[in-house]
Amino acid sequence: MERIKELRNLMSQSRTREILTKTTVDHMAIIKKYTSGRQEKNPSLRMKWMMAMKYPITADKRITEMVPERNEQGQTLWSKMSDAGSDRVMVSPLAVTWWNRNGPVTSTVHYPKVYKTYFDKVERLKHGTFGPVHFRNQVKIRRRVDINPGHADLSAKEAQDVIMEVVFPNEVGARILTSESQLTITKEKKEELQDCKISPLMVAYMLERELVRKTRFLPVAGGTSSVYIEVLHLTQGTCWEQMYTPGGEVKNDDVDQSLIIAARNIVRRAAVSADPLASLLEMCHSTQIGGTRMVDILRQNPTEEQAVDICKAAMGLRISSSFSFGGFTFKRTSGSSIKREEEVLTGNLQTLKIRVHEGYEEFTMVGKRATAILRKATRRLVQLIVSGRDEQSIAEAIIVAMVFSQEDCMIKAVRGDLNFVNRANQRLNPMHQLLRHFQKDAKVLFQNWGIEHIDNVMGMVGVLPDMTPSTEMSMRGIRVSKMGVDEYSSTERVVVSIDRFLRVRDQRGNVLLSPEEVSETQGTERLTITYSSSMMWEINGPESVLVNTYQWIIRNWETVKIQWSQNPTMLYNKMEFEPFQSLVPKAIRGQYSGFVRTLFQQMRDVLGTFDTTQIIKLLPFAAAPPKQSRMQFSSLTVNVRGSGMRILVRGNSPVFNYNKTTKRLTILGKDAGTLIEDPDESTSGVESAVLRGFLILGKEERRYGPALSINELSNLAKGEKANVLIGQGDVVLVMKRKRDSSILTDSQTATKRIRMAIN
């Protein structure tokens, strides 16, 4: 009561009433907002009124020694009054102008290095091309995009360690630089930023821009790579778009693009091998993209694409919980269902076993060119709202949704038999069978779906079976909208499992991804992809298989040679010879293999017939299961360049050419590397007879009798010594080996010993 009296008393004074009613700040919340906390609430206003004052800036006392009190025009540059609450000086904006014109000049060498991201951006814009502006409705959908062109892909923690090491090397705190990229970047930046005078904090901020991927969830119509996002405000408005071609590529976009291509190639190749999961892992681990190991990129790169996610799942990494069907990413936004096996009959009376989802569910569907909201019940499509770039894209989304709904009229619309197979020639599962069928031709599906009258709803139109828009009628439950559906924004990742056929499931057992979902689109990678795995040799065609097979043998010749002599079967079964088999005509593979294996056996048995070039040349043919036959061949055929080409068993051919003088091997005219023959072969096979199975002891010793010829050697007993005539009439003392196992090393040690013995 007392308070009210007091207030009444206050209000009776006319001035109080005037203040409280006429001034805009009559709300406690507002007063509180502008008077509490250190955070500036209206920075631009503050800036304006500060700059209207004479000395709005405070500076260190040293400024008074470095800047004169007045400029040429006699205007005061700083005040003798010190700033309240600190020992700084009050300074006029004119002092800044004076400093910019007359102040000391420091080296500018570090600016382009520290502000690299900005300098690069200017270059891209300078060389970019802006096209015409078009006015049209923009279907924008929010997507998670990379807003920071030109960055490396370090995690926040890794980047923090690099920044601390580069900018504050003497600060305390444990920093562990482990990854290849961390070490390279640290070394590079330390060298670049030696004697850098730019404020360390600024350097740290700029480094962060260079090292870490920053993503935002933005409305986009059109290109989503970072070089397009940086000009988003210039290229698309609410009702207009401006054509733009970036003036340069950036490493991060190139990595994303090349990673997708590598992952697709690897998943497609793994799917057709005997053990898809093992093959996939082997390929991921042996592939490099732009010189960086693919597995390192997969660990750091957040790109979400079907093939990339399958590779990540195989490596035990978490991936997004959304699932993929028909090239669309589905995310359940509400509802739930249970799965039950059901048998259904197609229009052709073929029985299909499908896993029916029972229950009401809502999904968002996001594809490259169309998006949709889907509401479905058990085997019934309740509503589908689609938006897309064009008629074709909208139709694709409708087909996928109709198949996904599992409606009976869709299954009855099948004409003919369903027998689609995947790359490994295995039948696809029923849902993908249906999808492939209608993607080929959806006419019957759309005709049989049913039509309904529609109400006029803003921003929505109906669509008829021939895909024409209509305001009166529409296919049942289906509408086309002007507004896009946003991509799923969450960056949450879940633990998944993968089976040996590369099907990825979440912890409830729902299939999120399978090789069928991997796009068949072929692209050209922007960064060099190096597949070291023999499984990927065929990606560039038969010639590449041929060259790679021979290069592999040459690179591993030392081990191959030992296996050739001690454990040939193991050698013949090596997976590196698998791709080569596809080049050998099927009908004759077995005979070739039998012939080459027999030839090799003779080489092992008969001293002096070991021939490096010939073994390398014929080895890949021995890998096929051999057929025993008495056939002899003087040449073997391989299918390259669209026809059969011959490899001569003895001698050179355009396919396989070894130049003894230069020691270079060329395959189909392409250099395949240097081939060092065994030293014992160069003197026309004479020395090799000595070496294999004999130990050279030194110079000739008369007490062991006259020099024997090569042929007489075979009569020696194990451990017996003799003088032998070798090569160009030199005589050396040898001993027949007591053990056969050491025969192989003879070839290597022999030459040295012969040279020593002769000299």
Curated annotation (Swiss-Prot):
UniProt-listed InterPro entries: Flu_PB2_2nd, Flu_PB2_6th, Flu_PB2_C, Flu_PB2_CAP-bd, Flu_PB2_middle, Flu_PB2_N, INV_PB2, PB2_helical
Biological processes annotated in GO: 7-methylguanosine mRNA capping; cap snatching; DNA-templated transcription; symbiont-mediated suppression of host cytoplasmic pattern recognition receptor signaling pathway via inhibition of MAVS activity; symbiont-mediated suppression of host gene expression; symbiont-mediated suppression of host mRNA transcription via inhibition of RNA polymerase II activity; viral RNA genome replication
Cellular component aspect of the GO annotation: host cell mitochondrion; host cell nucleus; virion component
Motif (Nuclear localization signal): 736-739
Record's keyword terms, sorted: Cap snatching, Eukaryotic host gene expression shutoff by virus, Eukaryotic host transcription shutoff by virus, Host gene expression shutoff by virus, Host mitochondrion, Host nucleus, Host-virus interaction, Inhibition of host innate immune response by virus, Inhibition of host MAVS by virus, Inhibition of host RLR pathway by virus, Inhibition of host RNA polymerase II by virus, mRNA capping, mRNA processing, Viral immunoevasion, Viral transcription, Virion
Positions bearing the site annotation: Mammalian adaptation: K627
Subunit structure: Influenza RNA polymerase is composed of three subunits: PB1, PB2 and PA. Interacts (via N-terminus) with PB1 (via C-terminus). Interacts with nucleoprotein NP (via N-terminus). Interacts (via N-terminus) with host MAVS (via N-terminus); this interaction inhibits host innate immune response.
Family to which the UniProt record says this protein belongs: Belongs to the influenza viruses PB2 family.
Protein name per its UniProtKB record: Polymerase basic protein 2
Organism field: Influenza A virus (strain A/Port Chalmers/1/1973 H3N2)
Gene: PB2
